[in-house]
Amino acid sequence: MVKLRLKRCGRKQRAVYRIVAIDVRSRREGRDLRKVGFYDPITNQTYLNLPAILDFLKKGAQPTRTVHDISKKAGIFTELNLNKTKLN
């Protein structure tokens, strides 16, 4: 199973995170399938690759709680629901 979760980068006391699609059995800093975003909690900057995230969500990837909250603020789930209603 694939999850969308945070991967810690940066230096000591100055963490930044990459949002990655990664296998559930991998470690936090393990090999990821694809980098789909970036999150800096100190400056509150976020970059999300929306097409890649939507593609993984459509294939069944599960976001962690933190990635879900970040994505919700960016409006990804409203876009995903709009795409579903267009298909029906």
Swiss-Prot record:
Alphabetically, the GO molecular function entries are:
structural constituent of ribosome
Statement: the UniProt record of this protein carries the keyword Plastid: yes
- Would the keyword Mitochondrion turn up in this protein's UniProt record? no
Q: Which domain of life is it from?
A: Eukaryota
Mind listing the UniProt keywords for this protein, alphabetically?
Chloroplast, Plastid, Ribonucleoprotein, Ribosomal protein
- Give the primary localization class: plastid
Q: From the UniProt record, give one GO term of the biological process aspect.
A: mitochondrial translation
Question: What's in the GO CC field?
Answer: chloroplast; mitochondrion; small ribosomal subunit
Name recorded for this polypeptide: Small ribosomal subunit protein bS16c
Give the organism, scientific name: Sinapis alba
Name the gene.
Answer: rps16
